[in-house]
Amino acid sequence: MADMNQHPTVFQKAANQLDLRSSLSQDVHARYGGVQPAIYQRHFAYGNYSNAGLQRGQATQDLSLITSNASPVFVQAPQEKGFAAFATDFLMGGVSAAVSKTAAAPIERVKLLIQNQDEMLKAGRLSEPYKGIGECFGRTIKEEGFGSLWRGNTANVIRYFPTQALNFAFKDYFKRLFNFKKDRDGYWKWFAGNLASGGAAGASSLFFVYSLDYARTRLANDRKASKKGGERQFNGLVDVYKKTLKSDGIAGLYRGFNISCVGIIVYRGLYFGMYDSLKPVLLTGNLQDSFFASFGLGWLITNGAGLASYPIDTVRRRMMMTSGEAVKYKSSLDAFSQIVKNEGPKSLFKGAGANILRAVAGAGVLAGYDKLQVLVLGKKFGSGGA
């Protein structure tokens, strides 16, 4: 990753030709911070981890990371372009992040409800399992109202700003610390340095904003429970913090943090591993300089890495859901084994379909918003994802 500026990829060529930068895994790179090839440094905000941000769409996307799925976009730091320009890009990126996240919030909440429904069933906050994406949408609107589809979105939007600031603070430090070059040090040392720098930067940023991701998850999964008198568990963002700190202390806000850090490494390893393996095989001949072929490969790799690492996102969010409950998982490994034993391996992928659909919503909104910025303001500013 350190030498990508010296050796432009097909993604970068395509981005230069069409001035298009995307950000696919919001929860996956947000979730899983890091830097992706140029065209994916602006993820089509769909989530954790992201994104994957991949937020980072930020390919930072936080995709994401995703995001994530979860996955934020890196714009140039103040010393590189001047504080005024940096502040403008930072604020406009925040507006773009708010627009894209808010537009994709309904499918994001449905994804989280389906993903964590078994924890809600055990806690008595869900009467029966969801039968699919459409049925979940219908039940949520019928039982809680149309506006409830945006529950938890405020915390998700707020998370963008500290994540961006922290990325600026950490990215250059870790880039210098693991400054391996592919042509100088060899592929494997470069690859290991890439994972180490991305993982360290992502984990460092995640440490400061994880509680917001936790609060977003709890609010999105806080449905009106008929068995509990139709009352919600939390009255808002501040109430999540107050009740969690009272019942579980600081540890309650960080449940699932360790496996989230592992997820950053796994996602980045899968992403760059597949990219380096498939690019020289598939992008040959006339396809080498084709924007659509490059974009298609990037979309395939981003979703492939996000899907392969999705069980980690499920485990971490299922662990989040046990804060304040009488029975908790002893560790991420215990959570993984219990989920597989009691619910089957398929349960680890619940909500994955909605996670992929979120990319479509994010892509359309970001593309339209970019066009609006050009028409109204005369230029396109940085935008955020995860």
Swiss-Prot record:
Gene field: ANT
Name of the protein in question: ADP,ATP carrier protein, mitochondrial
Transit peptide, from-to: 1-77
Entries under InterPro entries matching the protein: ADT_euk_type, Mit_carrier, Mitochondrial_sb/sol_carrier, Mt_carrier_dom_sf
Notes on how activity is controlled: The matrix-open state (m-state) is inhibited by the membrane-permeable bongkrekic acid (BKA). The cytoplasmic-open state (c-state) is inhibited by the membrane-impermeable toxic inhibitor carboxyatractyloside (CATR).
Stretches forming Solcar repeats: 84-177, 189-281, 289-375
Entry function: ADP:ATP antiporter that mediates import of ADP into the mitochondrial matrix for ATP synthesis, and export of ATP out to fuel the cell. Cycles between the cytoplasmic-open state (c-state) and the matrix-open state (m-state): operates by the alternating access mechanism with a single substrate-binding site intermittently exposed to either the cytosolic (c-state) or matrix (m-state) side of the inner mitochondrial membrane.
GO BP: mitochondrial ADP transmembrane transport; mitochondrial ATP transmembrane transport
